[in-house]
């Protein structure tokens, strides 16, 4: 039975556990364990490769380098998210000695790779060089990588500073030394990749001598090889045969470089000391000032090369040197049929690839549109909910004090946000209009589309289309929705809009609606909710901590679940009243941090946003009768009707 509302029907404070966000170090809970939905979440990279090799399923992977600026870091993380949609098996991040690569700077190799794993859910290889580094430095970098959740290292010697190679006293001089050290110090924790040179390393005495060095690296513990770029398939085929003859049996992945510009080609060739075939030079030289023409030629060349490699049966996958660009590589993969935007999701929310989160399969619904924030606020947990959220009075969410961490920043710059949300606001209705335009996809009066809100930096989720008309109607009237889901009763898990999990299952949802609204509307809503008491769970809270709910105090409400062959029921999304009090701090702060601070202090626009922050309520509603038609729209309609109904005194005044 649903509990009676705690708090009065008018909006008086009920402050128990309401205002503080806390920052305890771990979540104390005992969790039921359920079988994982996605086997790849529990496999290390070399196991994923082995399974693909056995099945004949080709993979692709992508290389990126750390950006030079903070803005570049924000853009690169956005690119990770976009390119993750195509299904890379892994990415790798290069090690730039000049850029303080092991530091906590947002442009460091370590931080970019950590962000890819933790916040983008990408299996990631971190390059690491031993050139000009002491043993203690290298070991420290490896321990830090492990602590950040990185499990794959590409062990490289690195390029010398200047033209001449100088040995480092107390350090390592060759990649094989680094491989041996990783295995000696960390055992089997890391999967190790090493570089192969299809034409031999430019500093090697001979091709055969270089192959012997490669064999030494594999014998020391390397799990697979990624090659330097090359331009002709026969170069790779000869290399693979030579490796086989040498007794090298691990996977060898060819490195592919789609030519994207004349200057980038010259720079890469200079660094790699490779010779470009004359027939390629003959094509590029006349069009060297036409970037589009060179890019198109590079795409055609890469597609042809990849087709020849794949047809040989010698290639387990393809590794692309992207130069931090996406267009050419994406186009090549699409033409090869390897870019697969599978709408199916292992779970309804974005995954992290950190090893300690591999069992995680339950989250509160509130962070559905801010998964990176949720991961940040729970990064100190020692274990993660698996099977059920559980009863907990202390979810221990870390505080979100810095809204400008590069992986949490809006992808849109200030100028673009002002064009979307308004250079100047004149009333609360101006704010309502922004929400409506975000939902409708129509441009504002200045011709700019609203593609994000402070609570959602992405386009609308596919399932929002099922509720679009209702959402538009209520947002026009000051019910400012930031999260919603329709009720679902047994849709196939393969459904392209609401499906998730393995095939052959069925998914279910309770209708959910979360929104900001004025105090007057909240008071009317509470009056209406009395007649829905046994069906609808509600929770209203404002920035001051006034808190009214009819939900059981410490009891989460499962609002998404799935039934799959041979498995227990999975409940990946809950509405948890305790977590909601932590979420409300973040949700209210976003009014100011993301929107209000776009305007000058004391300006009318800033004042309007501040008023909403100070006076509105954050509300969530759950319709527990998921097999029936969603009643939440009727609840809202009844509320608006009550709000607009003339008062008794007004009617008496108007009477003749």
Curated annotation (Swiss-Prot):
The lineage of its organism: Eukaryota, Metazoa, Chordata, Craniata, Vertebrata. SUPFAM superfamilies: FAD-linked oxidoreductase. Allosterically regulated by S-adenosylmethionine (SAM). GO terms for molecular function: FAD binding; flavin adenine dinucleotide binding; methylenetetrahydrofolate reductase (NAD(P)H) activity; methylenetetrahydrofolate reductase (NADPH) activity; modified amino acid binding; NADP binding; protein-containing complex binding. It is an enzyme of class 1 (oxidoreductase). Pathway: One-carbon metabolism; tetrahydrofolate interconversion. Phosphorylation of an N-terminal serine-rich phosphorylation region increases sensitivity to S-adenosylmethionine and inhibition. GO terms for cellular component: cytosol. This is Methylenetetrahydrofolate reductase (NADPH).
